Structure formats: structure tokens, C-alpha cells
């Protein structure tokens, strides 16, 4: 099944602050689920965003 990550896990993974994650949520940059006041991020959704924004290095 789907794996869901917490704010802390995603902040560590992306090396950003939890406040930056809040901005990403506000601007709908990252997919998330709000469940009972807790924010969770689907791992496959995060991977999709990262892959969609991947830029190849210049040669």
C-alpha cells in the first residue's frame, strides 16, 4: 500500500524547514492529506513532483 510521510520526514528528505513545507502546501506545490489536523504526504505523490521537476545537467 501507499506510504505516508510526516512533516518532519519530508522536511528532512527535502532539506527544507517545516515552515517552507507549509508554504508548499499553501501554494499547492506538494500533494498532501489533512487527516484529523495531521498533515501527511503520500510518498508516490512526492516522488512524482520531484521527477516532474527534474532538470538534466548541461553537458
Language-model features, listed with the residues they occupy:
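The DNA-recognition helices of helix-turn-helix-type DNA-binding domains
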Residues: 28-29, 53
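A short, Lys/Arg-enriched interface patch at domain edges and termini
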Residues: 45-59
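Flexible coil/turn residues that form the inter-helical turn or adjacent wing/linker of helix-turn-helix
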Residues: 3, 28, 39
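Short Lys/Arg-enriched helix C-cap and helix-to-coil transition segments
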Residues: 33-39
Amino acid at each position: 500500500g501507499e506510504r505516508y510521510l510526516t512533516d518532519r520526514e519530508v522536511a528532512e528528505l527535502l532539506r527544507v524547514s517545516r515552515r517552507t513545507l507549509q508554504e508548499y502546501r499553501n501554494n499547492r506545490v506538494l500533494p498532501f492529506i489533512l487527516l484529523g489536523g495531521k498533515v501527511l504526504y503520500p510518498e508516490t505523490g512526492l516522488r512524482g513532483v520531484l521527477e516532474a521537476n527534474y532538470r538534466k545537467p548541461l553537458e
